[in-house]
Amino acid sequence: MATSLCEPPPRLAARRPSAPPLSPRSKSLLLPRGARGGDLRPPAVSPLFLGRTALRRLKFEARASGSSSGGGRRQVRAMASLGGLLGGIFKGSDTGESTRQQCAGTVSVINRLEAEMSALSDSGLRDRTSVLRQRAQQGESLDSLLPEAFAVVREASKRVLGLRPFDVQLIGGMVLHKGEIAEMRTGEGKTLVAILPAYLNALSGKGVHVVTVNDYLARRDCEWVGQVPRFLGLKSIEELVLRGFNYCVIDEVDSILIDEARTPLIISGSAEKPSDRYYKAAKIAAALERDIHYTVDEKQKTVLLTEQGYEDAEEILEVKDLYDPREQWALYVLNAIKAKELFLRDVNYIIRGKEVLIVDEFTGRVMQGRRWSDGLHQAVEAKEGMPIQNETITLASISYQNFFLQFPKLCGMTGTAATESAEFESIYKLKVTIVPTNKPMIRKDESDVVFRATTGKWQAVVVEISRMHKTGCPVLVGTTSVEQSDSLSEQLQEVGIPHEVLNAKPENVEREAEIVAQSGRFGAVTIATNMAGRGTDIILGGNAEFMARLKLREMLMPRVVKPVEGVFVSVKKAPPKKTWKVNEDIFPCKLSSGNTQLAEEAVQLAMKTWGQRSLIELEAEERLSYACEKGPAQDEVIVKLRSAFLEIAKEFKVFTEEERNKVVQAGGLHVVGTERHESRRIDNQLRGRSGRQGDPGSSRFFLSLEDNIFRIFGGDRIQGLMRAFRVEDLPIESKMLTKALDEAQRKVENYFFDIRKQLFEYDEVLNSQRDRVYAERRRALESDDLQSLIIEYAELTMDDILEANVGPDAPAESWDLEKLIAKLQQYCYLLNGLTPDLLRSKGSSYEELQGYLRLRGREAYMQKREIVEKQAPGLMTEAEKFLILSNIDRLWKEHLQALKFVQQAVGLRGYAQRDPLIEYKLEGYNLFLDMMAQIRRNVIYSIYQFQPVLVKKDEDRNGTPGKPTTNGRSSGKPDPVSVESSSPAASPQASA
């Protein structure tokens, strides 16, 4: 937090000194030149300039100053327009035919170019990239290049992947290029669509980001469609890890821009060592009873101690007040109760080894490297008896909304966007366009089955699975937690139904690709959390090519992958033993001896050429991936592996095609939902695993009035229905019930929309501040000459001191020049020649005195710079850069903490009929002014006081007072408290 003008900065170290205060009267500080006033504003994605480094996991980085304002910044409306709202209501009936008609002309042009592209050699096709890039850089618009670029990508895809993009996929690419959201149904090939506009926009040389929702999809898509841009010569091995913000394609855009947008992106650093209080608080929470000692609001995710809870907790802890700032027990106790009641094992987190790992509620996946903040993660660790890791502090924070709004051109694709079109248009200015399907969708979505109690619901789910299993129809069961999936698995084991479980547990995550590959087989039953909800392509009859790859992988990897060296493994746990062994039941048949021999020969050649156990796993996976695709290959090992792969896939395909026909006759994939999600979109994502590309399929949801969504958000109507229906194992059919359930789900959607909107509005306050700070930091980081910036700091600091100690409105006769000189010399001992008479002679008015002090501030800086540079050339520049960056980083971190406290506090002001958001803006702005002033004061003060050992003697010869040094830094920094108490003449506070 920025320090006040009447107190010394906290914990100032000699090697990183902070400026002393100016005056107790100074409340309004000047912003650095160029800063603007006015309003200032809670995974897996990496940038992809379409090359080998295309792991698409989101890495947060501050934006450069050049893109922080101006035309690239989208103006945002807080609420949806009526047109956007009506669009969201009526768009569901749009089949995309209007979009087909609008794009028909361009599609025809691309189709006419197909014969020309097919006639080109591989090198000739690659050369088209150079030609197109040159035309783009010469000023030709990307719109005019689109037909030829799309034709090039279509031909490359045919050669490399064996897939020819359909006309509707070309239309999807055009929608994305226009900066809109393309709603495309499941199985329509969204991943391949993304390559079309990504290639086109990469021709400008400004880079493209492709974003997806998790590591599994990022890795899969990079290995698969990433071959197309690599084949066409778009590589970025030596490029920056994160390119500038130019064009971004977001896969599953509704998940990232809406579902994930309730939580900000936070970069945190390690703070203090954990306290033993977490363990003690966990024991207290275990002893306290719900509704007696505390109440729980599951909707708001908050807990509140009752009067008895306060008294009993204080008695156990032997303290007088839980909120005593010297002890701060309240935070520990409340977090411990939250961990007990609201954060449940195998629902919100899992235990792996001695770690508590968060499970993403939207994807069902473990969020590696993520931790809850504000001591909550430590409270969960204490509850589970795990070692408590260090507390964290926020170093940087940005909302998803503001992060993605940095892109001048943003687009996305998903199967479920129309219901949220109003929010997309109001926040992101993104229009939702329905793309027509390649084949009609014939999936049958059956009506929901509702029970009073969860016991009846789960019994009915088991009966449904058993019924469909007997017909041979593959079944995908969607659950909302690890706990539910394990419980259902136990029930299916009891009735003897073979099945697979896909959830966040490590043993299941490692088999994810294997499980998904066989989920569409005849009679298969798969229980999955939301991990199988997005991006999962379930092929009826099984995926023969993927099974062939798994067979080749289990033979190759153990022989060519280097074993994990002990030096790279954490001392806390042994390296995991990896065998790549696959359950034989996944394969549709036993591999013939001929193909087994062919694969063995290929593996032996790989060992001989690459070396036995000599490759890191990632490199071996990449080589195998390339061998299993259709791109041009001249390497002998790749050719041999590909030959084995194709023969194995051919053998498997005979059986999977036969099985596919049986599955189609049985009715296709049947999806069973076990709980309504917070949004209809997520329900539709689960349903969308069935009925891809015109395949048959069906879906049905089994619900209970005790489900979380209805229990927490259902209100009095659901409670009344629960009392009215007393039979637990009979389904309830009622129009009133259906209406009540729909209303509860709408309540949830509106509730979470309000959360996202509030987060966005509060982050908007921070956004302008973030832009200004990052611009200042980037300016210091990239500049080789910081003289002009330091001079600016010096002049503004002189202005601040003058205003704080004299004031622009005070008559010259009342100026306390002794006090002013004392403060100036406290900042800079090089100003030791100042006297009251000198100041009076140089400035009869406030403006003249201000000009003279600015001149002396510049001269003092240049004098210090000359002395240091004379003895150590280049040292002053390095010192200036270090001091600016370190002060910005430290004070910005403290500023974020201060703003968090303000945001928590302003909510109470609503009771006084004051708008919390306006209060937050005002206080946040004042805190920001204080911080920016403190940065420049600290920097210029540190530079004035900077005294390396080697220049000390030279300064003494120049008549400046000698100062003791410590480790090359001055330890003579004046302490305002001690100086003022011992020397009234030098004490602004004492004289005040």
Residue locations for each model-derived region?
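Extended, charged helical/alpha-beta scaffold domains that provide interaction surfaces
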Residues: 349-357, 363-369, 631, 664, ...
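Q-rich, low-complexity intrinsically disordered regions
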Residues: 27-28, 35-39
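Conserved P-loop NTPase motor core
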Residues: 2-15, 23, 29-32, 48-726, ...
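Acidic/serine- and proline-rich intrinsically disordered regions
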Residues: 8, 37-40, 58-62, 955, ...
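Polar low-complexity intrinsically disordered regions enriched in Ser/Thr and small residues
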Residues: 37-41, 54, 69, 182, ...
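Feature targets compositionally biased, intrinsically disordered low-complexity regions
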Residues: 33-37, 50, 65, 69-71, ...
